[in-house]
From Swiss-Prot:
ATP 1 binds at residues 402, 457-464, 492. This is Cystic fibrosis transmembrane conductance regulator. Residues 100-123, 217-224, 321-340, 878-924, 1020-1021, 1125-1138 are extracellular. GO terms for biological process: bicarbonate transport; cellular response to forskolin; chloride transmembrane transport; defense response to bacterium; embryonic hemopoiesis; germ cell migration; heart development; innate immune response. Detected in gut epithelium (at protein level). Detected in kidney, spleen, intestine and liver. Detected in pancreatic duct epithelium at 5 dpf and throughout adult life. Residues 83-353, 860-1163 form the ABC transmembrane type-1 domain. Residues 1474-1485 have a biased composition (Acidic residues). Phosphorylated; this activates the channel. Dephosphorylation strongly decreases ATPase activity. Phosphorylation at PKA sites activates the channel. Phosphorylation at PKC sites enhances the response to phosphorylation by PKA. Residues 424-645, 1211-1444 form the ABC transporter domain. Disruption phenotype: Considerable lethality around 10 dpf. No effect on initial pancreas development, but at 16 dpf mutants display loss of pancreatic acinar tissue. At 22 dpf, most pancreatic acinar tissue has disappeared and has been replaced by fibrotic tissue that surrounds dilated, mucus-filled ducts. Morpholino knockdown of the protein in 48 hpf embryos leads to impaired resistance to P.aeruginosa strain PA14 and strain SMC573, as shown by the increased bacterial burden, but there is no effect on resistance to E.tarda, B.cenocepacia, S.aureus MZ100, E.coli XL-10 and H.influenzae Hib EAGAN. It is found in: Apical cell membrane; Early endosome membrane; Cell membrane; Recycling endosome membrane. Epithelial ion channel that plays an important role in the regulation of epithelial ion and water transport and fluid homeostasis. Mediates the transport of chloride ions across the cell membrane. Possesses an intrinsic ATPase activity and utilizes ATP to gate its channel; the passive flow of anions through the channel is gated by cycles of ATP binding and hydrolysis by the ATP-binding domains. The ion channel is also permeable to HCO(3)(-); selectivity depends on the extracellular chloride concentration.
Length: 1485
């Protein structure tokens, strides 16, 4: 970016915005790029603004006042410019009260009694033009200054909120949601930019009302209060309508949230939706929700229409209430009438627009400031006291709990009870039932420099919490921790920040080439970096989406190792690595490169325990064992023999190792507890022995397993019962036997902060950071990286995508809190629209197509314009009648009569042109002519317009949804899910809520302005001649501005997204950031993103003001010309002069509003244009021509007639070539094979060999060339939906949508309950479903998070059985399954699918051993297709397809059933093995 010209611009250039001329010219001629945008002015730099406000806030906190005031801190920073701009605004508004006086003097100058003063009319008209000039010369800089000041306040608040976020303690992070934080910084703080311009009207409007009422009193006496009462009544009506809209908005938010949640699930699982052939039912589900949403949208739209129309219809109320009675009682005095009407125009704008807007602005602002004050006052992360002189690590009797809120509350209540004299009674009972369970209890250890401690233990035993305690994230309630303070940390879930791989490893540190290369080599990253197109400078996508899970884990480990620290905390860094890579890193990195460093490694592998200097074994937060491995063998022989005796313990999955370890520790601890009572810390109070509400608690655990608490509990639940109901978790901060009542989910034990709304619960920031809410909610975003990068194989990438994107959508659609989160999607979605091909404004064909979607809208517009033309014609006719009558009566009346009427006035002053009662017939004509432009649209003409546009919105949503669901996956794969969701969220919200009323306002204001110009032009044709060139100039100038303005707005939108992406990214890696002490580095990055956005936003505001400034100049010039022409061509008809000048003043007052509305409508029509682009997406099943229809029917007659097709399931593939995009490279090349009916074919190959691509080709989800036939029927001769329904699919990524379990099994409702229960029993789900409160009608949420991965796979099997599919496709079903569920899966395949053809894709050998034939693939080609016996001899092919670790397991596994158990196994081991065999069908939550 180049330096902004405003920095060197002189005063005139800044005042008239001449400095924007270069960017305006460039934007008009060519497309603007981000590099074309000027830098933000130095005064708007985020660091400067943040430092200034933070200084004042710290001063406020240090003042010692009971409650620090953010408003006072902001006032000390910004009060001077705020008051200065307010003063300019008041002077500019005050000129409006002088304008009617000059209008009255102009009319009075044409009084026959003041004929010598008629020459002053030119000067008075010129003075009126000067007043308008002075007004916009004051208002334009004032409004720009207020908007600029609002921008500065927003930037400063953004910065201090972000800085506070980096300081929040983990306990606080567990009480607030990510959605709340983002909503605070987006939907709320964004209001400062625009709404600050309304702030001063809170005091300007009352003053203006008083002044106008007093001046009207001088004109029409007591009737002035009637005018004020009439307009005030409209203000009360607006307040009532606003109040009525509240409940409707709340209901609409819930429905919108429900629709968007379901839409998000479908869009993120489009692959599965198409594979199952569920497009129609998914479309119906969303359509039903949308129907109810549109009904509420219509009600809200109607209320908004009446609210908006109050301004336009206010003139008629004033006329009826004040002007008409005065005219009927005292005759028509033109000076009084026109002056009064001019004041009433000022008054109606003040009462119906400015004052309500200002009150609403202050109400919203104060609520926002209070929220920010509360947020800034929250508890901060406290740095522990370190001793840099020591080199060892020591923990002494450390006890800690993640949430001591209930304990603190108890202490407070105890103190209050003591103060009140209550020592017993109910309070005592309360205390006996409430206890806090620490996550760590009396942990002691000591490590010398260079030693390695291996921490292992059961699930939820406190391993990660121990590391958090050492980091200082978890503050111990008792005990001491001593270490040097220089710590490096690698989190359990690899965290990748946006940037290059080198940036992620260096993490803001200086580059040391030797150290960097050593770390990369030790972490086994050399080959991966060499395969990347830009090596270690390859940019990472959000969350590292273009890296596999193992690659991300190694990058995160390299970051921790690169930092030179005294203590390294490594939280399960090998979770996603294969055995060979893990062994290399452990040897070369942990044991060699870091040999001189103190290391704490969380692991559950025996090999690591053997080589560690010390071992800490945790169970239920307590130290089960601490010492060396030989001491473990001698002191705990039962435990060590158990683990050492298990066959290939280190070779099974990490989840399974943890499960076995948990069961072992549980059994051993139970055996020990029979002989001795373990000591308990005084921290936990003994709970009551009698269980309370066990049945209710059991149901609660099933319904909401996320309620597993780290906080407190009212009840005692048997440990075995708790273990049975808890889901497996990779990361847990608490022992699994700790439960909590739902009333303790928030920070206040008296209130239920864990509120469920529409079946959802807000996710805390801590849960977001730790991913503690289970893997069931992990939803993966399929981005364009899936098809573009070759480093990560395609089939692996789908299973390795980070949870980051799904968490964004969770926060986006979480409406359980404040309603401001309704607009959160516009901020959270990281998608940036594709670069527009053109930089023109919205094309006219978009408007035409929008209107043509409902012909009723065209008829409504024609009707509106027709009525407006009739009213204009009637008004013009009335003007001629009035002026002719007045001219005739003026010449017929005698001077004495005129004097008589003049003396009849209450003030005794001679007023201009008092009309006799004989003219009362024409009174209505006068008022209709004056207020014609205000009533042009009428009352009932706007309501059909609003309802018709809402109907169009409904149709657009329906068409877009159908188009997306019907589009081929090859097209959808090139789009991010965020981009698709933006169309259904931000764009549809614009089209639903904002566009109808704004378009109506634009049409209405346009008719007002055009009607006024036509009226004055007809009365004085010379005005039309003067207006024509000015109108042409304005149209050209508008087009000139919009070319640049719309591009800058687009760039601003793109620059806004990284702000919130950075916030979300920082929250996810907050512990890593604080462990590395990189807060200042990330604050600098955040300020950089803020400055980038500020540059585009400030430039957009400046160019917009450039246009409005010149538009005002243009129309002030028009007003002055119109006034001079009216005065110069007058033929003793002061009524015409009054009408012309009044309407010209109305044009000036309405025009800028009309211009701003037109710009806003043009911007919103871009949302319509984007929706049309999605509607125009190609379809998978285009409608064929009639001629082709008949041919198709003839060729498919046999297949169509045979309702049992396919009956055998025979598959034949010939010369199949597959591409994911039409222009992409082939991922499968000339593939040919065949499978007989009922045959089981195993598909073997390395990740990326093309296994998943083959399944996609069979389902016609990709571009294909070649032939596939089932039972002799070619796929080109079969309808797409019927072809896909021939397959049953069990994908890697299981699709569980929000809705009843029954619908997830049988979406079309074709099967009875008996059939569903029978199938559930076949697949082993019956016992699971019976535990649900509503059985088959149990509501599944969040992708079925209450179900394990195994249960979801079984649901897919149940779907396949119910669908009657003859061919079953299983894509790596064992990837996330435990051994028990794998056995259930195998048994189901043998029994329920014995008559089906099965294609099983795996990269592991064991699940494939029961297959009859094997298709071995490599690099998209068939290497071998034969039996397992022959493949075992093809060692060269096996080496290419199977990893070394799996190759080691192949031969022992072949004859595992023939081996006898080793005699060394203890009875505990035998019991475990027997349970695994006996309880195959017992799948538990």
């Amino acid at each position: 970016m180049q330096r902004s010209p405003v920095e060197d611009a002189n005063c005139l250039s800044r005042y008239f915005f001449w400095w924007t001329n270069p960017i305006m010219r460039k934007g008009f001629k060519e497309k603007l790029r981000p590099s074309d945008v000027y830098q933000a002015p130095s005064q708007d730099a985020a660091d400067i603004l943040a430092e200034r406000l933070e200084k004042e806030w710290d001063r406020e906190v240090a003042s010692g006042k009971k409650k620090p005031s953010l408003l006072r801190a902001m006032a000390r920073c910004y009060i001077k410019p705020f008051l200065l701009f307010g003063f300019l605004l008041y002077i500019g508004e005050a000129t409006k009260t002088v304008q009617p006086q000059l209008l009255g003097r102009i009319i009075a100058s044409f009084d026959p009694a003041h004929e010598p003063e008629r020459a002053n009319g030119y000067f008075l008209a010129f003075g009126l033009g000067l007043l308008f000039t002075a007004r916009f010369l004051l208002l334009q800089p004032a409004m720009f200054g207020l908007h600029h000041l609002g921008m500065q306040i927003r930037i400063a608040l953004f910065s201090i909120i972000y800085k506070k976020t980096l300081k929040l303690s983990s306990r606080v992070l567990d009480k607030i949601s990510t959605g709340q934080l983002v909503s605070l910084m987006s939907a709320n703080l964004g209001k400062f930019d625009q709404s600050l311009g309304m702030a001063h009207f809170i005091w300007i409007s009352p003053l203006q009302c008083i002044l106008c009422t007093g001046l009207i009193w001088e004109l029409i006496d007591v009737n002035s209060f009637c005018a004020l009462a009439a307009i005030s009544l409209l203000g009360v009506l607006q307040a009532f309508l606003s109040h009525k809209m509240g409940p409707y908005k709340a209901q609409k938010v819930l429905l919108t949230n429900k629709r968007l949640a379901l839409t998000s699930e479908i869009m993120e699982n489009l692959h599965s939706v198409k594979a199952y052939g569920w497009e129609e039912i998914m479309e119906t589900l969303i359509k039903n929700i949308r129907q109810d949403e549109v009904k509420l949208t219509r009600k809200i739209g109607s209320l908004r229409y009446f609210y908006s129309s109050a301004y336009f219809f206010s003139a008629i109320f004033v006329i009826v209430a004040a002007v008409v009675p005065h005219a009927l009682s005292r005759g028509i005095n033109l000076r009084r009438i026109f002056t009064t009407l001019s004041y009433c125009m000022v008054l109606r704008m003040t009462v119906t627009r400015q004052l309500p807007g200002s009150i609403q602005m202050w109400y919203d602002t104060m609520r926002l400031i209070w929220k920010i004050e509360e947020f800034l006052s929250k508890e901060e992360y406290k740095l522990m006291e370190y001793d840099l002189s020591i080199t060892e690590l020591e923990l002494q009797d450390v006890t800690a709990s993640w949430d001591e809120g209930p304990g603190e509350l108890l202490e407070r209540i105890k103190q209050e009870n003591k103060a009140n004299g209550h020592h017993n009674g109910d309070a005592g009972l309360f205390f006996t039932n409430l206890y806090v369970a620490p996550v760590l209890k009396d942990i002691s250890l000591k490590l010398k420099k260079g030693e390695m401690l291996a921490v292992t233990g059961s699930m939820g035993s406190g391993k990660s919490s121990l590391l958090m305690t050492i980091l200082g994230e978890l503050v111990p309630s008792s005990g001491k921790i001593r270490h040097s303070g220089r710590i490096s940390y690698s989190s359990q879930t690899a965290w990748i920040m946006p940037g290059t791989i080198r940036d992620n490893i260096l993490f803001g540190l200086t580059y040391d080439e030797y150290r960097y290369k050593s770390v990369v080599k030790a972490c086994q990253l050399e080959e991966d970096l060499a395969a990347l197109p830009e090596k270690d400078k390859t940019p990472m996508a959000e969350g590292g989406l273009n890296l596999s899970g193992g690659q991300k884990a190694r990058v995160a480990l390299a970051r921790a190792v690169y930092r030179d620290a005294d203590l390294y905390l490594l939280d399960a860094p090998f979770t996603h690595l294969d055995i060979a890579t893990e062994k290399e890193i452990f040897d070369k990195c942990l044991c060699k490169l870091m040999a001189s460093k103190t290391r704490i490694l969380v692991t559950n592998k025996i090999e690591h325990l053997k080589r560690a200097d010390k071992i800490l074994l945790l169970h239920n937060g307590e130290s089960f064992f601490y010492g060396t491995f030989p001491e473990l063998q001698s002191e705990r022989p039962d435990f060590s023999s158990l683990l050492l005796g298990l066959e290939a313990y280190d070779n099974i999955s990490a989840e399974r190792r943890c499960s076995i370890l948990t069961e072992t520790l549980h059994r051993v601890s139970v055996d020990e507890s029979a002989g001795m009572q373990p000591e308990r810390s005084a921290f936990r109070q003994v709970p009551p022995t009698k269980p309370m509400y066990i049945d209710e608690r059991k149901a609660s655990v099933i319904v909401n397993p996320l309620g597993v608490a780290r906080k407190a509990s009212f009840i005692q639940v048997p440990e075995e019962e708790v273990r049975r109901t808890l889901p497996d978790r990779k990361f847990s901060l608490v022992p699994e036997n700790e439960l909590v009542d739902e009333s303790f989910m928030g920070s206040d034990v008296y209130h239920n902060h864990g509120v469920h709304m529409a079946g959802q619960r807000r996710q805390s920031v801590l849960a977001f950071m730790t991913n503690a809410q289970g893997q069931g909610r992990r939803e993966h975003l399929q981005s364009s990286f899936r098809r573009r990068l070759s480093v990560v194989p395609q089939s692996e990438l789908a299973s390795e995508l980070d949870i980051y994107t799904r968490r964004l959508s969770d926060s986006t659609y979480d409406m359980t809190g404040i309603l401001e989160e309704e607009n959160i999607e516009a901020c959270l979605t990281d998608e940036i629209d594709e670069i527009e091909e053109t930089f023109e404004t919205t094309k006219w064909n978009t408007y035409v197509r929008y209107v043509s979607n409902n012909k009723s809208l065209l008829y409504v517009l024609i009707f509106i314009l027709f009525i407006a033309a009739i009213e204009i014609a009637g008004s013009v006719a009335g003007i001629f009648l009035i002026t002719d009558e007045l001219w005739r009566e003026e010449h017929q009346r005698s001077e004495p009569n005129m004097t008589k009427h003049s003396n009849a006035s209450s003030s005794g002053q001679t007023y201009a042109i008092t009309v006799t009662p004989t003219s009362s017939y024409y009174i209505l004509y006068i008022y209709v002519a004056t207020s014609e432009s205000l009533l042009a649209m009428g009352f009932f003409r706007g309501l059909p317009f609003v309802h018709t546009t809402i109907t169009i919105s409904k149709k657009l949503h329906q068409k877009m949804l159908h188009a997306v669901l019907s589009a081929p996956m090859s097209v959808l794969n090139t789009m991010k899910t965020g981009r698709i969701m933006n169309r259904f969220t931000k764009d549809m919200a614009t089209i639903d809520d904002m566009l109808p009323l704004l378009m109506f306002d634009f049409v209405q204001l346009t008719v007002v302005v055009v009607g006024c110009i036509l009226v004055v032009s007809i009365v004085r044709p010379y005005i039309f001649l003067a207006a024509t060139p000015l109108a042409i100039i304005f149209i050209v100038m508008r087009k000139y501005f919009l070319r640049t303005g719309q591009q800058l707005k687009q760039l601003e939108t793109e620059a806004r997204s990284p702000i919130f992406s950075h916030l979300i990214m920082s929250l996810k890696g907050l512990w890593t950031i604080r462990a590395f002490e990189r807060q200042a580095y990330f604050e600098a990055l955040f300020h950089k993103t803020l400055n980038t956005h500020t540059a585009t936003w400030f430039l957009y505001l400046s160019t917009l003001r450039w246009f409005l400034f010149r538009a005002d100049i243009l129309f002030v010039f028009f007003f002055t010309l119109a006034a001079w022409i009216a005065v110069g061509t007058n033929q003793d008809k002061p009524g015409e002069i009054g009408i012309i000048i009044c309407l010209a003043m109305l044009i000036l007052g309405t025009f800028q509003w009309c211009v701003a509305t037109s710009i806003a409508v043009d911007g919103m029509m871009r949302s319509v244009d984007r929706v049309f682009k999605f509607i125009d997406l190609p379809s998978e099943t285009p409608k064929p021509d009639k001629g082709k229809d008949s041919d198709l029917i003839i060729e498919n007659v046999d297949a169509q007639a045979d309702s049992s097709w396919p009956h055998r399931g025979q598959i034949e593939v010939r010369n199949l070539t597959v591409k994911y995009t039409e222009a992409g490279h082939a991922v499968l090349k000339n593939l040919s094979f065949s499978a007989e009916g009922r045959q089981r074919v195993g598909i073997l190959g390395r990740t990326g060999s093309g296994k998943s691509s083959l399944f996609n080709a069979l389902l016609k989800l990709v571009y294909t060339d070649g032939e596939i036939s089932i039972d002799g029927v070619n796929w080109n001769k079969m309808p797409l939906q019927k072809w896909r329904k021939a397959f049953g699919v069990v994908p890697q990524k299981v699709f569980i949508f929000t809705g009843p379990l029954r619908m997830n099994l049988d979406p079309y409702g074709c099967h009875s309950d008996e059939e569903l229960w029978r199938v559930a029993e076949e697949v082993g789900l019956k016992t699971v479903i019976e535990q649900f409160p509503d059985k088959l009608d149990f509501q599944l949420e969040y992708g079925g998070y209450v179900l394990s991965n195994g249960h979801k796979q079984l649901i897919c099997l149940a779907r396949s059985i119910l669908s009657g599919a003859r061919i079953l496709l299983l894509d790596e079903p064992s990837a996330h399954l435990d051994p028990v569920t794998i056995k259930v899966l195998k048994k189901t395949l043998r029994q329920s699918f014995s008559t089906c053809t099965i294609l099983l894709s795996e990269h592991k050998v064991e699940p494939l051993l029961e297959c009859q034939s094997f298709l071995m693939m490599d690099k998209g080609q068939v290497k071998t297709y034969d039996s397992i016996q022959k493949l075992l001899n093809e060692t060269s092919h096996l080496k290419q397809a199977i990893s070394p670790a799996e190759r080691l397991k192949l031969f022992p596994r072949r004859n595992s059933s023939m081996r006898t158990p080793q005699s060394k196994l203890s009875s505990v081991t035998q019991t475990l093995q027997e349970e695994a065999e006996d309880n195959i069908q017992d799948t538990r939550l």
